[in-house]
Amino acid sequence: MPARSLKSAALFLALSALSAQEPTLFRTDSRLVVLHATAEDKEGRLVMDLPKTAFQVYENGVLQEIKSFRKEDVPVSLGLIIDNSASMTDKRARVAAAALGLVKLSNPEDEVFIVNFDEAPSLDADFTSDPKQLQKALARIDSRGGTAMRDALRTAIDHVKGRNKKDKKVLVVVTDGNDNSSLEPLDTVIRVAQQNDVLIYAVGLLSDETPREADKAKRALDALTRATGGQSYYPQDVSEIDRIAPQIAHEIRNQYIVTYSPSNQELDGSFRQIRVLVDSPGVKNIRTRSGYYATPDNRKSAGS
C-alpha cells in the first residue's frame, strides 16, 4: 500500500476512535435581550424590593419567559455629554460641579468619559475614574455658539459601544437649548441607542429659551429618554441641578436587570416593541427601553 494510503488509513482509524469516545455536541446560540428597568411609586420614588414574580415582559405583544432577574448595583460605563455653547458660559461651573458630584455618588468601579459639544462634539476625557482628569475636561470652555446635541450623543454612543469595559451603558446629557447644528437625525440616534441598550438621562436648562424653542428641545429630549428607559429633568434654575444629579446617580445604582430569550429568534431587522408590566400595588410607573431592532449584530445578545 502506498505511503499516502497508509497515512490516510491511520488518520481515518484515529478519527473513528475519537468519535466513538466523544458524544456529539449540539450547540445553541439563543439571542438574549437585557433590560434595565426602573420602578417608581406614585410620588416618583424608587421601588426597590420587587420579586421576579411581579414582572411580566412582552415583546410585540407576546409574553416572554424571564431567564434571569436581579436588582444589583453593577458598575457602568458612563458618559457625561455637556453643552459647551456660548449660552452655557454662566452655567458651566455649576453644571461641572454637579457632574462631578454625580460621579462621586456613582459606583466606585464605574468608568467615565466626557464629551463636550457646541457646534461639534469633542471627546475631552476618555474612560477614567480619575476625578482630576474629569475636572479638567469639564473645565474646558471653547464655545462657538451652536448646539449639536444629537451629533454629540451619536459620538458618545459609538464610543461607549466600542470601548466600554462594563456591560451597562449610561449617558447623561446636559443642554440649555434646542439642537441647531447637528447632522445626525433624531430617529437615528434613538435607533442606535436602543440597539446598544444605552440608557439616556437628560437635563434641559431651558428657562431662557423661547416657549417654541423650549418645546422643540423638550420633545427631542423626551423622545430620547423614553425610548431608552432614562428620564428627563427640566429645572427652572441651574441651581436645581445640585438636586437632580444625586437622583440620577441613585436611580442608576438601583435598577432591575431583566433578561429574556425572545420567543421569536428571527433576525429580520424588524423593530421589536418591549413592554414591561409590574403587578404590585406600590408601583405606579415602570421604565425601560421601548424596544430594539432584531439585526444580525445582536445575534448573541441585544444590549448586554
Task: Give a label for each model feature.
Residues A20-S304:
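Scaffold/interface architecture of coatomer-like assemblies
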Residues A10-A20:
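Hydrophobic h-region of N-terminal signal peptides that target proteins for export
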Residues M1-A10:
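Bacterial N-terminal signal peptides that target proteins for export
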